[in-house]
UniProtKB/Swiss-Prot annotation:
The active site is at residue 104. GO terms for biological process: cytidine deamination. One of its GO terms (molecular function) is identical protein binding. The gene is cdd. This is Cytidine deaminase. It is an enzyme of class 3 (hydrolase). It comes from Sodalis glossinidius (strain morsitans). Keywords: Hydrolase, Metal-binding, Zinc. Its cofactor is Zn(2+). GO terms for cellular component: cytosol. This enzyme scavenges exogenous and endogenous cytidine and 2'-deoxycytidine for UMP synthesis.
Length: 309
């Protein structure tokens, strides 16, 4: 069993422990629970879904990477599919604070990358900050999203973000978690003084980055982008750009890829190479921040691919 789960698992009821431990122990566990698994755990613990999420919050918080604040926040996104997705805050040494990921962003991005279509609720162990409330308002569930906090009655996002400004005010039709595929194609490599050759078209890192960019959410700037990361063991993780109506709460594609890596139990210091794919001649670029943050994590083979329709 992964050691980081041990303290949280020790606090659950014996019946729930018996049902939960084998799931966490499985080599393929990657920070989310399928609807059948959720039902099994609810029955074992005699809990409804919201109560189960509160019980599981310490497991989500165990994913936190907090070398700066040492303040661990966990969140669980509840999809309409019945699946549950863990998220936690992530901080990166030697990178700007703006690269930090909040737990709520982590859980939402995790659900998005796993193919969830809509969220019913978000359970979190601390009150969401204003940044996260604005990020949540980009979702296709909008202000109907239910926020669940310990020792408080569940309430909608509308109650936490009154008089909200969001994509609907800008007549944006495509919302975060809506299914979309822009079908971008590779245009040209923009590799910057790399000694390593650019990947060929059959490289899974290229196809993964292309697909991620095609499914990214950038309705304001049209600067769609995606990232693919390959670790030392050969595993590949995708990340998509999630733009926000308020701009600043936008989540870069590198961060969403790191969220997926963290959920899978991978070490972000083991990234061997990466590809950033972004739209040709777009008004903004993810390149400087992506390259700098990956360098801080010890990855120096970062390829830059421009895209066309």
């Amino acid at each position: 069993m992964i050691a980081r789960f041990a303290p949280a698992l020790a606090a659950v009821s014996p019946a729930l422990h018996t049902a939960l431990a084998p799931l966490l122990d499985h080599h393929a566990f990657a920070g989310w629970l399928s609807a059948p698994q959720v039902k099994e755990l609810m029955q074992a613990g005699g809990l409804d879904e919201d109560a189960l999420c509160f019980t599981l919050l310490p497991l989500a918080a165990a994913y936190a990477v907090t070398p700066l604040s040492h303040f661990n926040v966990g969140a669980i996104a509840c999809g309409i599919s019945g699946n549950l997705y863990f998220g936690a805050n992530m901080e990166f040494l030697a990178a700007p604070l703006q690269q930090t990921v909040h737990a709520e962003q982590s859980a939402i991005a995790h659900a998005w990358l796993r193919g969830e279509k809509r969220l019913r609720a978000l359970t979190v162990n601390y009150t969401p900050c204003g940044h996260c409330r604005q990020f949540m308002n980009e979702l296709n569930s909008g202000t109907d999203l239910i926020i669940c906090l310990p020792e408080r009655s569940a309430a909608t996002l509308a109650s936490y973000l009154p008089d909200a400004f969001g994509p609907r005010d800008l007549a944006i039709q495509s919302l975060l978690l809506d299914e979309i595929d822009h079908a971008f194609a590779a245009a040209a490599w923009l590799d910057h003084d790399l000694s390593a050759p650019s990947p060929d078209d059959n490289d899974p890192l290229v196809s993964t980055a292309l697909d991620a960019a095609s499914r990214s959410h950038a309705p304001y700037s049209q600067s769609h982008s995606g990232v693919a990361l390959q670790t030392q063991d050969g595993c590949v993780y995708a990340g998509r750009y999630a733009e926000n109506a308020a701009f600043n709460p936008s989540l870069p594609p590198l961060q969403t890829a790191l969220i997926l890596m963290n959920a899978a139990g991978a070490d972000d210091r083991q990234i061997r190479r990466a590809v950033l794919a972004e739209r040709q001649n777009a008004p903004i670029t993810q390149w400087p921040a992506t390259n700098a943050t990956l360098a801080a994590l010890g990855c120096h083979e970062v390829h830059h691919l421009s895209l066309s329709l």
